[in-house]
Structure formats: structure tokens, C-alpha cells
Amino acid sequence: MRFFSYLGLLLAGLASLASLAGLVSLANLQDFSTDNPLEEELRCWCQYVKNCRFCWACQDGFCKNKVLKNMPSVQEHSYPMEHCMLHRQCKYIRDGPIFQVECTMQTCDAIRLLNV
């Protein structure tokens, strides 16, 4: 009988350690953010998760993928050039939801370009 109580204590201790390790890994996951991935991870993210907003940039009023240069710009799925420049967002509709992407161009620069 005593053997089983020691075994129970041992298993309870191991379960506590495993749960503590789980908490540590959860804490690490919470610190991980996909808002600003490392430069070396950008290709992987933008190749497989093309709707991530950090994969797209506003270039000449059209939304272009930052990593996949041969990927067509999103002009056929997006609002006009003025919207992209003035609102600093790349928006496009693809099979339902509207994906929004922040543009890198400042609003004052866009207004100056539009008035030229």
C-alpha cells in the first residue's frame, strides 16, 4: 500500500512539473507577436499567409506583396489608387472577407501626389 502512495506522490510531482512547463511555454507564446516578424521570417509568412498585413505595402497607389515580387499587385481586387494613398490602407476582397493592409505612404505625401 505504501508503494502506491509513493507512486501517487511521484506522479503528482511530475504532473506539477509538466503543468509548470506548460505555463512557461504559454508565457513565451504570449510574448510572440506576428505583427512585426523578423526579416528572415517574412518570406515564410508572406508565402503561406498572404493576407497578413505586414506582407503588403502601398506602391504607386497599388498594394504589392513585399516579398513575392512576381505576385500580381492587388489592384484588380482593391479600391482605386486614391483610396490606397489617402487612407493608407490596402483593401481587397477575396472570396468573402475584406482584408486591410496598412500602407507605408503618409497621407500628406499622397495628397501632394494627387494634386500634381
UniProtKB/Swiss-Prot annotation:
Keyword vocabulary terms for this entry: Early protein, Signal
Domain of life: Viruses
Magnesium is among the record's keywords: no
A Pfam family of this chain: v110
Induction: Expressed in the early phase of the viral replicative cycle.
UniProt key word Signal: yes
Signal sequence, renumbered to the chain: 1-19
Sequence similarity: Belongs to the asfivirus MGF 110 family.
Its biological purpose: Plays a role in virus cell tropism, and may be required for efficient virus replication in macrophages.
Name of the protein in its database record: Protein MGF 110-2L
Organism field: African swine fever virus (isolate Tick/Malawi/Lil 20-1/1983)
